Amino acid sequence: MYSMLDTDIKSPVQQSNAPIGGPATPGGKGNASTLDQDRVKRPMNAFMVWSRGQRRKMAQENPKMHNSEISKRLGADWKLLSDSDKRPFIDEAKRLRAVHMKDYPDYKYRPRRKTKTLLKKDKYSLPGNLLAPGVSPVASSVGVGQRIDTYAHMNGWTNGAYSLMQDQLGYSQHPAMNSPQMQQIQHRYDMSGLQYNPMMTSAQNAYMNAAASTYSMSPAYNQQSSTVMSLASMGSVVKSEPSSPPPAITSHTQRACLGDLRDMISMYLPPGGDASDPSLQNSRLHSVHQHYQSAAGPGVNGTVPLTHI
C-alpha cells in the first residue's frame, strides 16, 4: 500500500496506466474514491484465489453467517485439500504475483495503520488523557515528568526535602539516657524509690505497699536479718491500712523493730513471770502502738490512720 508521499512522487502517466485492483464506487464520495484509487492491493495468494469463489458460494447458502465464521470454515476446508487439489490455485497465485511485480516494480508492502480499537486504547491511556490529541508519546511523557517536578516544588519544598526531613526527624538518643541514674533504673528494679502520689487510689496504694514490703531490693532492706523480714511481712498482713514505706531504714529504726518484736512475742506468752506484771503489759502495748504509728505515717489526704482498731 502506497502512502501519500509515494503517490506524490509517482508520475501521473503511471497512475493512469496502472491497473486498479478494484473498480471505484460510482456513487461514493470523492475522498473515498481517491483513497481507493491510490491504494495498491497486495497480490492474492493461493488461498485467496481459491476462497474467492468459495466465499461467495457459502455466503449465498448461509446469508446470516458472519464473515469471520465463513473465513474459519474456509481455512479448515483449505487444510483438508490435498497438494494436487491446491496446485492450480498455487500456479494462479504465482502468475498474479509476476503481473503485480511487473506493474509495480517499486512496490513495498506496508502494513495497515492501527485499527480503531488500538487508537481508542491509546486515547484512554494516561499520557493521552493528560495532553491534547496530536501530541507524540515522547512529548507526553516529558510533559508528565515536568508536571510532577512542578508539584514537587510547591509550598517551598524541593525534591530532596523529604529525605532531609526524615533525617532531621530521626529518633536520636537523649544525652540524659547515659546518666548513672538512668542506667541504675534500667539495670535494677528498685521499689524503694517510689514515692507517694496523692492521686493514687487506696487500692493502688495497698498494692504498691504489699509489693514494696515483699519485693524491695534496696541495700538497706538487704542488710536486715530474717527476723526483721518476717516482721515486715507480718506487719503487712495485720495492717491493711494504706501507707508508703520509708526509702531507707536507719539503725535506730532497726533497734526499735527488734524491741517491738520481743514485746509482741511476750504478749502471746502464757501468763506468768514478767508477763503478768501490769506495768510491763502497759509498756508493751505502748511500744506496739508507737510501732504502728511509725509504720503507718500520715494517712491518705492527711487523715490520721485508724490505729485504735
Swiss-Prot record:
Induction: By bmp-antagonism. Fgf is required for maintenance of expression, but not for induction. A motif (9aaTAD) lies at residues 260-271. Keywords: Cytoplasm, Developmental protein, DNA-binding, Gastrulation, Nucleus, Repressor, Transcription, Transcription regulation. Expression is restricted to the animal hemisphere of the uncleaved egg and early cleavage embryos. In late blastula and gastrula stages, expressed in the dorsal animal and marginal zone. In neurula stages, expressed in the developing central nervous system including the otic vesicles, branchial arches and the lens epithelium of the developing eye. At stage 23 (early tail bud), expressed in the neural tube and around the anterior neural plate. Throughout tail bud stages, expressed in the brain, and in the otic vesicle and branchial arches. Pfam families: HMG_box, SOXp. Gene3D superfamilies: High mobility group box domain (1.10.30.10). Residues 1-36, 270-309 are annotated as: Disordered. Transmembrane segments: none annotated. Changing N45I: Abolishes binding to 5'-ATTGTT-3' DNA sequence. Reduces binding to the nodal5 promoter. Does not affect ctnnb1-binding. Residues 40-108 bind DNA. GO terms for molecular function: beta-catenin binding; DNA-binding transcription activator activity, RNA polymerase II-specific; RNA polymerase II cis-regulatory region sequence-specific DNA binding; sequence-specific DNA binding. GO terms for cellular component: cytoplasm; nucleus. GO terms for biological process: brain development; formation of primary germ layer; negative regulation of BMP signaling pathway; negative regulation of canonical Wnt signaling pathway; negative regulation of DNA-templated transcription; negative regulation of transcription by RNA polymerase II; neuron differentiation; positive regulation of transcription by RNA polymerase II. Changing A93S: Does not abolish binding to 5'-ATTGTT-3' DNA sequence. Residues 278-293 have a biased composition (Polar residues). It is found in: Nucleus; Cytoplasm. InterPro entries: HMG_box_dom (IPR009071), HMG_box_dom_sf (IPR036910), SOX_fam (IPR022097), SRY-related_HMG-box_TF-like (IPR050140). The 9aaTAD motif is a transactivation domain present in a large number of yeast and animal transcription factors. Transcription factor with sequence-specific DNA binding activity. Binds to the consensus sequence 5'-[AT][AT]CAA[AT]G-3', showing a preference for 5'-AACAAT-3' and 5'-AACAAAG-3'. Inhibits beta-catenin-mediated dorsal axis specification by binding to sites within the promoter of the beta-catenin-regulated gene nodal5. Acts maternally as a transcriptional repressor of nodal5 and nodal6 to restrict their expression to the vegetal hemisphere of early embryos and thus establish germ layer formation. Interacts with ctnnb1. This is Transcription factor Sox-3-A. It comes from Xenopus laevis (African clawed frog).
